[in-house]
């Protein structure tokens, strides 16, 4: 009777669903379905205190659509019951749409209710602290765990059978529900529930029957002897039962996800919609491509060596207000180890134990705003490569003979902390301890202004073009013959005290030596030839072979003078009468004939004195540009990349000012260095004490470097660059060539050598 009366007020139950309806003092289980969904719960007698249920597996053979109602009371069967909660016991199908909870129900209370969690421990002891307000009836409250002590051990439950536990409300001793609760914060408010229904029966693979538990914290004397009275039966409210998925979704707010600042940046994650991808450009990509054609090599040392070409980037597309970190690292581009064999790089096999990636090198300006990064180019000029793993920050440890790929990373420090990585294939390089490919060495010299060591030791890798050029100069000098000095074609200045027209000091009677040419700077362009000054000098040499260094009027003759490219800058020629107090010349002529002191290969006549002006200054008017060999610099010795005037020239020779084993007439150091591009000041020459020599005697070279002839002295700059057919040069330091006659450290070399020798002291 009660079952029919109750089910008439319950909404339609779908196939395969089970509802557990809890009343004050009773619990009714309803089931609708096939034979496998039936449950037989026998009713117990009034005198019995046993309560038992059978599992679903023991219900086979029951009639379809059979309904049994089990009503458990303490001493009698209640005539009118009032429902408390409705439970689905997780029998709802997955295709069932999520039901909307009742608008009067508290979602948080309903979600965390013990009836909707499969874990008994979580359901009883991890519920949030809130009022025991029932979501469906304003006068009914659920007893929540824990009540006093949050420790689960205090509320350890013991399995018992069919007992009823309740708590009476002091304000309502009759047990009849009030219209509204007197105080929602009252912890001893009236609460009715059946033993075991605080932890509902949940069908699972590990539990075949529900377990009835008793709260030991409630004293036994508070239990009623005759059950409940004066309770009115009410119908089940019309509400939708939430699905299991909805209940589990409402549990997720209990675990707070980490904030955006605490989350680590994920490289593979997609950036947020408001994030714009940064664009990275390689500024010196053309230079990198030149090196990449020959397989770029980078020197690595224990102390650390900087890269050339450098990594220079330009960023765009960043948020100007956001902050970013910019850093680089390097990864192995190829697992093989390489070696340079037969002029090319050959893989030798895979190497084990090599780290795939290096550490990171953060730019010194990091962190900074996007406006700062986009304002200027980002150059990692302080990055150093090393093979010492004990180095601190500022170094990237790489292995030699392996190919590495540099990468640049842009990390957004705000929002989602998105990390962007960019790489350029032309920046790949091989780490070496010494350069293997000569093409890479040449490119380093041509483009790196700090490649000083290669220019100082240039003779160790002299090129074929330069050797052929030196041989051509030797051949031209051998074909030139000196002519008799006359008043008509003399070119020696008249107002110069120490520079007369003279015979060669090294002239011998056997005619094996030729005259040494005077430098171009010793010629006074403003003075014409004077016969009065030339007569004594020419007469003094009449007793010898008669050869002098005056030019013949024949167009085939060549004046063997050093051109303007040997150290003087453009402008007026220096005054030979200008002296200094120390009695030494002020600089050293240390620039080879094929190089300009201004830092570039000479391709135009602007680097030299014009031929027509040179002829006018000499007073003879018979010279042309094509007749001076050093004015015609072959283009083969010029750098292939010399179209850019800003690039420093390559292969300059650095001539040491003086040796360490003998006195020298030079003072100071060389005016030029390997990377210098500034024009030097004109050198100052000094006079020497006058020495008289008898006519007819050979002129000699004094220990002070003064050529004495015909009551006049000539100061000769001791270090001199050039190749002569019969002159002996010596080398006592790096590229330190000097004129013969001085006892200095070094080896006197034969003049027939086709190229210069380098002596390592």
Swiss-Prot record:
Main location group:
nucleus
SUPFAM superfamilies reported in the protein's UniProt record: p53-like transcription factors (SSF49417)
Per the record's keyword annotation, is Nucleus included, yes or no? Answer: yes
Q: Which CDD domains match?
A: T-box_TBR1_2_21-like
Give residue spans, biased composition: Low complexity. Answer: 180-191, 198-210, 656-687
One Gene Ontology cellular component annotation?
chromatin
Where is the protein localized?
A: Nucleus
The alphabetized list of GO BP terms reads: cell fate specification; positive regulation of DNA-templated transcription
As annotated, the DNA-binding region falls at 287-456
Chain segments carrying region Disordered: 1-85, 167-210, 496-515, 545-612, 637-687
User: Biased-composition ranges for Polar residues?
Assistant: 37-61, 167-179, 496-510, 637-646
| Database matches in InterPro entries | p53-like_TF_DNA-bd_sf (IPR008967), T-box_DNA-bd (IPR046360), T-box_sf (IPR036960), TF_T-box (IPR001699), TF_T-box_CS (IPR018186)
What GO molecular-function term can you cite, just one? RNA polymerase II cis-regulatory region sequence-specific DNA binding
Disulfide connectivity? none
Biased composition (Basic and acidic residues) is annotated at 600-612
Keywords of the record: DNA-binding, Nucleus, Transcription, Transcription regulation
Q: Which domain of life is it from?
A: Eukaryota
Biological role:
Probable transcriptional regulator involved in developmental processes.
Q: Which PANTHER family match?
A: T-BOX DOMAIN-CONTAINING PROTEIN, T-BOX PROTEIN-RELATED
- Please state what the protein is called: T-box protein 1
Originating organism: Patiria pectinifera
């Amino acid at each position: 009777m009660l079952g029919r009366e109750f089910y008439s007020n319950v909404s339609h139950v779908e196939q395969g669903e089970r509802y557990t309806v809890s009343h004050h003092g009773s619990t009714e289980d309803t089931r609708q379905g096939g034979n496998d969904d039936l449950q037989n719960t026998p009713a117990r007698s009034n005198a019995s205190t046993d309560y038992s249920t059978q599992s679903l597996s023991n219900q086979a053979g029951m009639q379809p659509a059979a309904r049994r109602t089990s009503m458990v009371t303490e001493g009698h069967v209640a005539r009118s019951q009032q429902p408390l909660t409705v439970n689905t016991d997780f029998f709802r199908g997955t295709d069932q749409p999520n039901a909307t909870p009742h608008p009067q129900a508290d979602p948080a209370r309903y979600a965390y209710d013990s009836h909707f969690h499969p874990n008994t421990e979580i359901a009883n002891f991890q519920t949030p602290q809130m009022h025991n307000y029932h979501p469906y009836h304003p006068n009914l409250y659920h007893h929540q765990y824990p009540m006093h002590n949050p420790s689960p051990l205090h509320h350890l439950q013991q399995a018992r059978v069919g007992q009823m536990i309740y708590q009476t409300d002091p304000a309502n001793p009759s047990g009849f529900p009030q219209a509204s609760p007197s105080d929602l914060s009252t912890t001893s408010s009236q609460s009715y529930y059946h033993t075991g229904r605080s932890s509902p029966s949940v069908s699972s693979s590990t539990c075949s029957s529900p377990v009835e538990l008793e709260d030991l914290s409630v004293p036994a004397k508070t239990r009623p002897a005759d059950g409940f009275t004066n309770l009115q039966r009410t119908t089940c409210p019309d509400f939708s039962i939430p699905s299991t998925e909805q209940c589990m979704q409402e549990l997720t707010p209990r675990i707070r996800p980490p904030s955006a600042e605490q989350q680590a940046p994920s490289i593979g994650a997609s950036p947020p919609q408001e994030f714009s991808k940064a664009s990275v450009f390689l500024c010196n990509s053309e230079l990198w491509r030149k090196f990449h054609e020959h397989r770029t090599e980078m020197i690595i040392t224990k102390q650390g060596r900087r890269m050339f070409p450098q990594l220079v980037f330009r960023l765009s597309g960043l948020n100007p207000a956001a902050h970013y970190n910019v850093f680089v690292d390097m990864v192995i581009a190829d697992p093989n180890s390489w070696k340079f064999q037969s002029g090319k790089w050959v893989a030798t096999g895979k190497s084990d134990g090599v780290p795939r990636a290096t550490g990171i090198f953060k730019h010194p300006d990091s962190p900074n705003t996007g406006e700062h990064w986009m304002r200027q180019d980002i150059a990692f000029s302080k990055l150093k490569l090393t093979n010492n793993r004990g180095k601190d920050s500022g170094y990237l440890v790489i292995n030699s003979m392996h190919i590495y790929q540099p990468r640049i990373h842009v990390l957004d420090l705000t929002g989602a902390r998105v990390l962007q990585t960019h790489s350029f294939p032309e920046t790949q390089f091989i780490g070496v301890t010494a350069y293997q490919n000569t093409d890479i060495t040449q490119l380093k010299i041509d483009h790196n202004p700090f490649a000083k060591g290669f220019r100082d030791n240039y003779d160790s890798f002299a090129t074929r073009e330069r050797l052929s050029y030196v041989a051509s100069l030797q051949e031209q000098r051998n074909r030139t013959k000196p002519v008799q000095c006359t008043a008509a074609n003399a070119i020696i200045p008249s107002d110069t005290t120490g520079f007369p027209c003279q015979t060669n000091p090294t002239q011998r009677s056997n005619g094996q030596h030729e005259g040494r040419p005077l430098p171009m700077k010793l010629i006074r362009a403003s003075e014409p030839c004077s016969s009065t000054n030339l007569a004594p000098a020419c007469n003094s040499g009449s007793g010898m072979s008669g050869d002098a260094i005056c030019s013949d009027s024949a167009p085939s003759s060549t004046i063997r003078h050093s051109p303007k490219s040997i150290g003087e800058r453009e402008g007026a020629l220096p005054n030979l009468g200008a002296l200094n107090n120390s009695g030494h010349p002020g600089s050293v002529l240390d620039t080879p004939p094929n190089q300009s002191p201004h830092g570039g290969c000479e391709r135009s006549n602007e680097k030299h004195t014009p031929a027509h002006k040179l002829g006018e200054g000499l007073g003879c008017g018979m010279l042309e540009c094509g007749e001076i060999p050093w004015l015609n610099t072959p283009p083969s010795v010029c750098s292939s990349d010399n179209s850019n005037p800003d690039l420093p020239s390559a292969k300059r020779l650095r001539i040491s000012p003086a040796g360490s084993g003998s006195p020298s007439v030079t003072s100071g150091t060389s005016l030029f260095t390997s990377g210098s591009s500034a024009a030097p000041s004109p050198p100052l020459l000094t006079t020497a004490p006058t020495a008289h020599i008898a006519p007819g005697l050979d002129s000699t070279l004094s220990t002070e470097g003064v050529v004495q002839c015909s009551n006049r002295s000539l100061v000769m700059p001791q270090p001199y660059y050039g190749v002569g057919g019969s002159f002996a040069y010596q080398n006592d330091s790096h590229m330190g060539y000097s004129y013969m006659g001085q006892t200095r450290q070094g080896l006197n070399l034969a003049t027939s050598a086709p190229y210069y020798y380098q002596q390592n002291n």
